[in-house]
Design a protein with these regions (language model features):
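Short basic helix-loop element that most often maps to the first helix and adjoining turn
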Residues: 21-37, 97-105
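Residues that mark the N-terminal boundary/hinge immediately upstream of a DNA-recognition element
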Residues: 33, 59-62
């Protein structure tokens, strides 16, 4: 049985790598050993290493657990897609377009 390979767009991988680096810097600024953060997050040291590298194969829950272990930084996840300007514009366009009722048979 082979492992499923995660296909990630280059721009997305850049974002994940940057996020992983920021998580690592947050841990280092707090002078927290990797072993302690991994234990607090309930993950292995290897998984923490993958989080800090921005690996796309790591579950979103692991990223959230690590952020929580860094003094409740997981609350920042609430900011993801909060301002969906493009989605709102699409929704507004749909609301402006008049929809006709289906023709009655008879």
């Amino acid at each position: 049985m082979s492992k499923r390979k995660n296909v990630v767009m280059p721009g997305t991988q850049d974002i994940l790598s940057q996020m992983g680096e920021q998580i690592k810097l947050a841990r280092l600024r707090r002078e927290l050993p990797a072993e302690l953060v991994a234990e607090r997050a309930g993950i292995s040291r290897a998984t923490l290493w993958n989080v800090e590298k921005g690996s796309p194969s790591v579950a979103m829950g692991a990223y959230a657990a690590v952020l929580h272990a860094l003094n409740n930084m997981d609350r920042d996840l609430l900011l993801v897609a909060k301002d969906d300007e493009f989605g709102r514009k699409l929704q507004d366009l749909g609301l402006l377009t008049r929809k006709r009722a289906p023709k009655k048979e008879g």
